[in-house]
A protein has these predicted regions:
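Short loop/turn segments at secondary-structure transitions that flank enzyme active sites
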Residues: 87, 100, 293-295, 308, ...
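Short helix-capping/linker segments at secondary-structure and domain boundaries
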Residues: 143-148, 224-226, 306-313, 336-341
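Noncatalytic scaffold domains of N-terminal-nucleophile
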Residues: 2-41, 45, 53-237, 242-294, ...
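Extended C-terminal regions of large enzymes
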Residues: 289-297, 402, 417
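Internal maturation/activation junctions in enzymes
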Residues: 9-12, 199, 248, 252, ...
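A short, polar/charged loop-to-alpha-helix boundary motif
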Residues: 104, 432-436
Length: 436
């Protein structure tokens, strides 16, 4: 129970510490957090109109494709979801990750002179195209857990795209990067005409209108409206509009034009996929995450390792505390680089990676006074896995880290809780500028 004094400190700030300007915020309809205030506003509009957390999450995920195009992601991207239904107590992971194109085989890349998959930016970036999974996943959430129509959840993003949003500093900083300009020049049309003002970076606060994106969103919404009051049929035809109709045709043609591997057939065969989340326990809490088709288990592995340290005794954010947490994360990331992959396609010792005994062995590697240079050696989770008898794949990780670890840019995230206790979150990513 929080007493009156504690409540005051939470709301006004502890006067014995520097003020943060971030008091506790209370609400009655729900809470939403995202990477941009207009993304959050899209979801809050849905909550105030009577929608649930899942409706709001879908609305905000579509809105983020308009409000954060240079920052994080686009409709040509992917997303992972974690969903908790208060009524049933069900927790589900949902993959909106794009699968590889049918053309993307080792033999194909070798025939092009590549012994690893080339990623963007660059002339060979189209060879790394995957199926855009985020749209299918959003409609899957709306279909299974939502209450509102396609038009309801797409209206905020349509308005943002057609009427414009204010340009903001982070997005403009990305536009100033030479690789953004070169990518637009390499893959016309669209980028330079939409995001630049006669070749110059716009001023903060100027209007960014994305009419073509608005047209795609409106086309899906209108397709759903054509089904009348049948909400589920509306969702199905909106999904087909993107993956089987004119939009899929345009994506296939555009991919072919730039030498990409993605075809309309790849889109037609795509399905977002639900799965059971993986989990671990930490100090009495059960913590859930997606499996190794994401990097979600990194957090769970790190928590398992950190159970072997008295973080409270070390003191929050003391040098020793930060050192210990950092080293635990590095051990988990080393395993990520070596063993993570989609269990549907490659053998992964998921149970071994999340084994408490394995974590105990890894925890012993942390030197209390010295940081490991770069990433440490990956471990041997196969020893702790029920699949030990399987042939363990040879890790492709090299000591010293991968280029991905040097990236400064990240992605975006959306979390929603409604008044019924439903909780939903999404991490849409990729398909935007130098990430594509």
């Amino acid at each position: 129970m929080i007493d009156k004094n504690t409540s005051y400190v939470l709301e006004q700030g502890d006067f014995n510490r520097p003020a943060t300007g971030r008091p506790v915020v209370y609400g009655t309809n729900g809470v939403i957090s995202s990477g941009h205030y207009l993304t959050s506003m899209a979801g809050m509009r849905i909550l105030l109109d009577g929608g649930n957390a899942f409706d709001a999450l879908v609305a905000s995920t579509f809105a983020a494709s308009v409000t954060e195009p240079t920052a994080s992601y686009s409709l040509g991207a992917e997303s992972t979801f974690m969903l908790y239904c208060a009524e049933s107590g069900e927790i589900k992971a949902l993959s909106g990750q794009g699968t590889a194109a049918a053309m993307s085989t080792p033999q194909f890349f070798k025939s092009k002179g590549h012994y690893s998959i080339p990623t963007g930016p660059g002339l060979d970036a189209p060879l790394s195209f995957t199926v855009p999974g985020v749209v299918a996943a959003c409609f899957s959430v709306l279909e299974k857990y939502g209450t509102m129509t396609v038009m309801d959840v797409l209206t905020p993003s349509i308005e943002y795209a057609e009427h414009g949003i204010p340009n903001y500093e982070y997005m403009l900083d990305r536009l100033k990067a030479g690789k953004s300009v070169s990518q637009f020049e390499r893959f016309p049309p669209g980028g330079l005409e939409i995001f630049f003002n006669n070749g110059s970076v716009p001023e903060p606060g100027s209007l960014l209108v994305q009419s073509a994106l608005g047209g795609i969103l409106r086309k899906m919404a209108d397709a759903a409206v054509s089904m009348g009051d049948n909400r589920l049929k509306g969702i199905a035809v909106a999904r087909d509009c993107f993956y089987r109709g004119e939009i899929a045709d345009l994506i296939g043609v555009a991919s072919n034009r730039v030498g990409g591997v993605l075809t309309k057939s790849d889109l037609e065969n795509y399905q977002a996929k639900y799965s059971e989340p993986v989990s671990t326990t930490y100090l009495g809490y059960t913590v859930y995450g997606q499996s190794t088709w994401t990097q979600g288990p990194v957090c769970l592995q790190a928590l398992n390792i950190l159970e072997h340290f008295d973080l409270k005794r070390l003191g929050h954010n003391t040098p020793q505390y930060i050192h210990t947490v950092t080293e635990a994360l590095k051990l988990a990331f080393a395993d990520r680089e070596a063993f993570y992959g989609d269990p549907d396609f490659v053998p992964v010792p998921v149970d071994g990676l999340l084994s408490k005994d394995y974590a105990a062995a890894r925890a012993k590697l942390i030197n209390p006074v010295e940081a490991a240079p770069g990433l440490p050696e990956y471990g041997d989770p196969w020893r702790y896995s029920s699949a030990t008898g399987s042939v363990a794949p040879q890790p492709t990780y090299s000591i010293g880290g991968s280029p991905d670890l040097q990236q400064e840019s990240g992605t975006t995230h959306i979390s929603v809780v409604d008044q019924a206790g439903n909780m939903a979150c999404a991490t849409p990513s990729g398909g935007a500028f130098d990430k594509s």
